[in-house]
């Protein structure tokens, strides 16, 4: 049985899977409800926050590209006049404020993190020497030689979690990244779920 509030940390791939959706029926909105009810305390690495914002920016850029292509396709098939006349003029809009749109997406995420009273783990919890030791000894998450260098963020996040929670304080880690899970998995006080939904089912 869990002790509440349950400390929960979430990997970037979980936010990606949720597509940063904050509608009333989304897993992230459900997380907010669990926080408000005192069941969950969210603790995130500053690396996860930064990666998530970068992924939001990437999503905004993709959406702008899709809109640009949709505009071009519509104008190949019809005219501006007809498109506006039938009430679909929004598709003709040219996006000129991409940076502003990215900022809005990032602000939405920041507001969400504030709403759920997120504790952010900083770089002060990272011992670069220990991470480099793991890198050269090919310990998790560095065991795959082809992807070794791209695993540094996971190694830093795993170390932040270990330093923050020690060997006794229970923490739930939500991730579907096997290398990251192996990097975190040395402590008995770490509980793993591959999705927010699976955690909710267990609460």
Predicted regions mapped to residue ranges:
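Conserved nucleotidyltransferase catalytic core and NTase-mimicking acidic/glycine-rich helix/loop elements
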Residues: 173
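Active-site-proximal, substrate-binding regions of enzyme catalytic domains
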Residues: 2-170, 178-203
